Amino acid sequence: MRFFSRLRTGFAFARRSTRVLRDHPRLAVLPAVAGVAGLLYVAALWGVVFAVTPSPDQPVMVVALLALYFGSTFIASYFTAALMFCAKQTFDGAEPSIREGLRAAGRNIGPLLAWAAISAVVGVIIRMIEENDSLPAQLVAAVFSVAWGVLTYFIVPVIVFEDVGLTEMFARSKQTVTRTWGESLGAAGGVGLVTVALVIAGALPGIVLLFALPSLGLLAFALIVVGVLLAGLAGQTLTGIAKTALYVYATEDETPEYFDGIDFGDSGDGGSGGSGGLSGRFPGSGGIVGRKS
């Protein structure tokens, strides 16, 4: 029954993350800005590529793909770092400050750029492997992609909260995942299912209108797009909040505010309110490791 226990923990994380977002809706501003900035970057990049080379060859496409992955990863990571800093403020009982979150991300712009560059190279390698249609290549690409995602799951909170070098930040992310894999899997699954439910709920009014009044198809389509975008925005924000809570749990001696009552150790909801974090798993870690001021 461990699967259902993890799933209960995941839904508990999703509920508590929703409470955080409900009490502090301004947190959604950061993923929204990230989405707009990312779209503008992609549009500008491809505009330049096709303006300079109307029929780009493979070397040009590889460079363009590197630039695409690099810029997209940096933008997403920068605003995610700001979101996580703000989420941590709410866990400390303070009012989140978007300005302070952006400043915290700005202080770590070097590591974020390095992370984006490494991620871009890995992304292009995976993409090149995927272009081989053979089954072994597809399997290698899939395994490589999953392993990379697991290894770097906590890379952004490590960057924003810890003073570590390039190699160490990957080691710290891996260590945190290794010691909280069950909780991380449950939280990701719970928030993912909630996001799917939000997408369905967001698209439903437009779908109903489309079938009820086909003549208003354009309006119905607009409602569907807006509903799905808002649901995706909420899902991204909830993911950032839940991941920050997991990270704080892994590095502090207390369960984050809003997440009291979740028995992390048993992966259930409503057990021992103070599980004591993972300070026992991280020897000598009282509070966030190497906390940045």
Model-derived features with residue positions:
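Hydrophobic alpha-helical membrane segments
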Residues: 1-293
